[in-house]
């Protein structure tokens, strides 16, 4: 069938428009259309390409949306080695670097370009006639993995440049702080291993063979290097940064041209103070000789260029002693080693415990009980042991043995597959797994049974009263009274009332509480909107699940594996028999007053929890996001607001108090309470 010419032209036009709007949004940070208008353009393109698949090209913007499951990453040789950088934390050493450069070049002063050192993953991107054809990881510096398909999901990487040049560039892929925190929060809810920092999260994301994982994690990029710059008439690094932005790449806006080393040091000191204001982690400043002809004269060693150096920020670091290393067992059986420390003050908080992530990490760092260690707060958030002070060992230190059995149930331990870094308890009846599963099930984001705390859960499981999560709905006053001291009649009555109330929990929260790996609240909402009942979800196939926007192959397999388990089906049957709400009717939106509006919330609200205000906004046709951007319409501000307020003010986003929001939507809080909606 011959394709009409006007269809071909429309598809080309749509691609050009979408790439132009990507450029304005990601590179210029100045969008001129709404998210809804952008989505309409993308949807039209997807539908046309679905109808005329022969017109689909590898560089079409639609390829960012589709999903692929790769067999493996092929290894490709870099056209030019990706070298590492020498680094220093010391002002005297940066002056020594400048002195050495000036001496070799026989110059009194040298122009430098200073760029923020992003805590991410280095990549090489190749374009032919302006079209993205290959993306490589750094690998060993000589060869890297072909991660082209994954990099296509990073929206700020252009698939078509604004000029038809053939060029290779290099840059950093990173995960914004809010996305990193969201991802770790999601993983915490489903008992997944947490990422230590955004760099690890980025690296782990880019290594995924299932491209849907990348699409569901918001990665970003900054490009900073052009291979063979003389081909494009570029004489300096400063010129190169301007040219990169001009042809469509996202370039860090905080780079600075410095006339001498004093200005470099001033820049470094300025960003030591200001780095916490950024929406991504940085760990220093990269200092580069500006002129390319000077770079050529200086050359490189086999490991690093002589014309550049990383000027690292001083870490928030403290010295302490490892008192003990204990092993915790999570809901899915993951064994996590935790260091108990002599308490230290670090970045305004007392640190007593630090996760050691896994046993490979302990072996790599050679951490022993009794060691003196340095603990840092990466990005000012997560404390971790970064190094051991081996010189201070006295011989009394003890190596921890990798467990050969579960510390709780003495069951077998092992790894699920060769790529699994986590050691797990393989006993399906391990009481530690059940305890953690119950904690997830009754947590605030799920059934929200406040009376079921950690200590009571321990007693219920240890006594044998609770053998699975559904058993809590069959507890009797007499059984609870037999648990011993501290369990009075009033407490029993309150607990049973809360358990009864929990039967009315919305389906998406029940799904969240089940703890299916990688299924957090967002995914649970998607599943609820699609299937509306547990029974329909139970009968869904992997293929059916992967057709749903936001559900990739890994999540789909986890869902299927979870519900295929006979024990799970028994639990679902018990929950249904107990009277839980396992079916959700179609939501009836009374008003569309917030249609097409996007909100964010910061601070503590007096009338609503975060979940309740989110539910209210959604019921009125609006959306609630976890972060503030130019596409956010309003930020609802409560008591003790966080960084979202500052960002909203900087972006000019409208602010509403809680009362102003209620007036805006014409809702009386008293009526809401009378209707028991909140």
Swiss-Prot record:
Residues 589-678 form the BRCT domain. NAD(+) binds at residues 35-39, 84-85, 115, 138, 172, 288, 312. Pfam families: BRCT, DNA_ligase_aden, DNA_ligase_OB, DNA_ligase_ZBD, HHH_2, Nlig-Ia. It catalyses: NAD(+) + (deoxyribonucleotide)n-3'-hydroxyl + 5'-phospho-(deoxyribonucleotide)m = (deoxyribonucleotide)n+m + AMP + beta-nicotinamide D-nucleotide. Gene3D superfamilies: 5' to 3' exonuclease, C-terminal subdomain (1.10.150.20), 6.20.10.30, BRCT domain (3.40.50.10190), DNA ligase/mRNA capping enzyme (3.30.470.30), Helix hairpin bin (1.10.287.610), Nucleic acid-binding proteins (2.40.50.140). CDD domains: BRCT_DNA_ligase_like (cd17748), LIGANc (cd00114). Its EC number is 6.5.1.2. Zn(2+) binds at residues 406, 409, 425, 430. The active site is at residue 117. DNA ligase that catalyzes the formation of phosphodiester linkages between 5'-phosphoryl and 3'-hydroxyl groups in double-stranded DNA using NAD as a coenzyme and as the energy source for the reaction. It is essential for DNA replication and repair of damaged DNA. This is DNA ligase. It comes from Pseudothermotoga lettingae (strain ATCC BAA-301 / DSM 14385 / NBRC 107922 / TMO) (Thermotoga lettingae).
């Amino acid at each position: 069938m011959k394709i009409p010419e006007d269809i071909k032209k429309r598809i080309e036009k749509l691609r050009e428009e979408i790439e132009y709007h990507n450029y304005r949004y990601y590179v210029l940070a100045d969008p001129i259309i709404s998210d809804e208008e952008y989505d309409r353009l993308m949807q039209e393109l997807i539908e046309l390409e679905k109808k005329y698949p022969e017109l689909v090209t590898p560089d079409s913007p639609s390829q960012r949306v589709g999903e692929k499951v790769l067999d493996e990453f092929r290894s490709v040789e870099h056209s030019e080695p990706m070298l590492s950088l020498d680094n220093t934390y010391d002002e005297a050493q940066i002056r020594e670097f400048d002195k050495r450069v000036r001496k070799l070049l026989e110059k009194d002063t040298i122009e430098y370009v200073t760029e923020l050192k992003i805590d991410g993953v280095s990549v090489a991107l190749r374009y032919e006639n302006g079209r993205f054809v290959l993306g490589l990881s750094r690998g060993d510096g000589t060869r890297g993995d072909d991660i082209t398909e994954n990099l296509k999901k990073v929206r700020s990487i252009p698939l078509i440049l604004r000029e038809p040049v053939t060029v290779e560039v290099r840059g950093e892929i990173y995960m914004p702080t809010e996305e990193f925190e969201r991802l770790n929060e999601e993983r915490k809810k489903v008992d997944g291993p947490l990422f230590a920092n955004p760099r690890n999260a980025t690296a782990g994301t880019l290594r995924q063979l299932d491209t849907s994982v990348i699409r569901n994690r918001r990665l970003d990029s900054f490009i900073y290097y052009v291979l063979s710059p003389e081909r494009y008439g570029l004489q300096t690094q400063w010129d190169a940064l301007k040219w990169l932005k001009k042809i469509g790449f996202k370039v860090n806006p905080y780079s600075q041209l410095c006339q001498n080393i004093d200005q470099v040091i001033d820049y470094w000191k300025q960003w030591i103070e200001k780095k916490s204001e950024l929406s991504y982690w940085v760990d220093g400043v990269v200092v580069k000789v500006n002129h390319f002809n000077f770079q050529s004269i200086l050359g490189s060693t086999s490991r690093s260029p002589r014309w550049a150096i990383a000027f690292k920020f001083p870490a928030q670091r403290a010295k302490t002693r490892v008192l003990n290393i204990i092993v915790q067992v999570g809901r899915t059986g993951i064994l996590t080693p935790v260091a108990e420390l002599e308490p230290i003050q670090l970045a305004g908080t007392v640190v007593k415990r630090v996760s050691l992530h896994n046993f490979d990490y302990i072996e790599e760092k050679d951490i022993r009980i009794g060691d003196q260690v340095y603990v840092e707060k990466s990005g000012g958030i997560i404390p971790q042991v970064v190094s051991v002070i081996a010189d201070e060992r006295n011989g009394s230190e003890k190596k921890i043995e990798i467990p050969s059995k579960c510390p709780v149930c003495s069951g077998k331990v092992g790894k699920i597959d060769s790529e699994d870094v986590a050691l797990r308890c393989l006993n399906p009846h391990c009481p530690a797994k059940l305890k953690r599963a119950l904690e997830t099930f009754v947590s605030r984001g799920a059934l929200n049974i406040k009376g079921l705390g950690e200590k009571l859960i321990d007693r219920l499981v240890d006594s044998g009263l609770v053998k699975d999560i559904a058993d809590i709905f069959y507890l009797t006053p007499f059984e609870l009274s037999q648990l011993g001291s501290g369990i009075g009649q009033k407490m029993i009555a309150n607990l049973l009332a809360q358990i009864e109330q929990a039967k009315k929990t919305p389906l998406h929260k029940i799904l969240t509480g089940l703890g299916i790996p990688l299924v957090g609240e967002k995914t649970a909402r998607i599943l609820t909107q699609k299937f509306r009942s547990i029974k329909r979800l139970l009968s869904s196939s992997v293929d059916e699940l992967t057709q749903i926007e936001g559900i990739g192959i890994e999540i789909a397999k986890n869902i299927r594996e979870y519900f295929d388990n006979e024990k799970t089906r028994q639990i679902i049957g018990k929950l249904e028999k107990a009277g839980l709400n396992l079916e959700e009717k179609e939501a009836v939106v009374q008003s569309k007053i917030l249609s097409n509006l996007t909100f964010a919330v910061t601070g503590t609200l007096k009338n609503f929890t975060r979940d309740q205000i989110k539910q209210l906004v959604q019921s009125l046709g609006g959306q609630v996001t976890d972060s503030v951007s130019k596409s956010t319409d309003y930020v609802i501000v409560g008591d003790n607001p966080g960084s979202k307020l500052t960002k909203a003010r900087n972006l000019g986003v409208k602010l509403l108090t809680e009362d102003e929001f209620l007036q805006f939507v014409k809702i009386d809080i008293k009526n809401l309470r009378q209707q028991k909606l909140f």
